[in-house]
Amino acid sequence: MAKPETLKRVLKEQHIDKNVVEKINDGYENVNNKSPKKKKAEYLFHAVDEMDSSLDKESCRQIMELCACTIDSSGLNKIVAQFAEKTNGLSLKEKIEKLANINHLGNPALREDGTMLVDLGSGSTCPCPQISGIEINNPISFTYCMCCGGHLKYQYENALGIRLEVEIKSSILQSMGKKPCVFILVKRDA
């Protein structure tokens, strides 16, 4: 999930209505990336609830995808760039099999229909570093998880050299730990 400062920046960059942004940040104006984890989680869950009630689904998706924490991760970006260079010329299936060896990219599988299924988090603990260890008492909207979706989309596009769309199949947060975090990546036309 987004860091609080990233979400606040993306809301501005996407020209979200000032009144909506005020509702999202109301009471959380001073929450930043250095705030205690519990306070950050409280703000982020509140922000997602406000976004879901004030914005259309596609706007929520775009905002959260742009908040992906690894977009600015020079370490992972370098590893993915090296992977893309080393696997140039391999089939999509071969590349996907090798992607499973890179930390933080989940367990990918190429399906017969050409889509990719990526298991990002199994068990009952959300893989999101912004909320790990925080007790979750209610189901959390898929909107929250689109940040991880954006992470996968960004890294897989760079690793595979193709344009992708991402969908959420299931989420630990939304299912209260009953289902894993699974995403579907679909190749899209350029």
Mark where each language-model region is.
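Active-site helix/loop of acyl-thioester processing domains in fatty-acid/polyketide metabolism
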Residues: 142-161
